[in-house]
Amino acid sequence: MRERGLLIVFSGPSGVGKGTVRAKIFESENNFEYSVSMTTRKQRPGEVDGKDYYFRTRDEFEEMIRNGQMLEYAEYVGNYYGTPLTYVNQTLDEGKDVFLEIEVQGALQVKEKVPDGVFVFLTPPDLEELRGRLVGRGTDSAEVIASRLEKAKEEIRLMSEYDYAVVNDKVELAAERVKKIIEAEHYRVDRVIERYVHMIDDVKV
């Protein structure tokens, strides 16, 4: 019996380094699939449907919402973005671990539907470090940075909704911590007990 994969939900405040840590995790040999999001925004030159995004019309996306086919979704700058439930379930059934990198509010939506997922919160060492990273991007005004820091405070308060908290003090260390969490989750008794119960039942004494 093939073991079903794990749904790994990875989130944290803006600027904490989610994408950088996730990329470092994917550098080593693994059984991970990065979840492909669905969007209603226009397809850009060079983008491949089903690889970069699943591109759908607004009507198609809203119909999927009504039919309960989205694991999570949000509207941003007039376009929908979300995670299709069928893709996630098919990939998990193939025995692969699905890595879902999303914002905190999206993660809470997922937890309602998939409570046995592995929820990992990436946090900065402190808010001053986070401020430095946001300033270092050089893309946001002082007002935007202040707004992001206030939102970060709200998100950090929701850390208790997660299974694990990982400090991103160094990218390499943070990536190793997340990999160890995932490895340990595969050996939890509630995930493997059926396999071993069948083994005992099959033995004739």
Curated annotation (Swiss-Prot):
Protein purpose: Essential for recycling GMP and indirectly, cGMP.
Compartment list: Cytoplasm
Keyword Ribosomal protein in annotation: no
Main localization of the protein described in the UniProt heading: cytoplasm
Family: Belongs to the guanylate kinase family.
Protein name: Guanylate kinase
One example GO MF annotation: guanylate kinase activity
UniProt-listed Enzyme Commission number(s): 2.7.4.8
Record-linked InterPro entries: GK/Ca_channel_bsu, Guanylate_kin-like_dom, Guanylate_kinase, Guanylate_kinase_CS, P-loop_NTPase
Disulfide-bonded cysteines: none
Pfam family, one: Guanylate_kin
Positions that bind ATP: 12-19
Key words, A-Z: ATP-binding, Cytoplasm, Kinase, Nucleotide-binding, Transferase
Top-level taxon: Bacteria
Chemical reaction(s) catalysed: GMP + ATP = GDP + ADP
Enzyme class: transferase
GO cellular component, one term: cytosol
Domain Guanylate kinase-like: residue ranges: 5-183
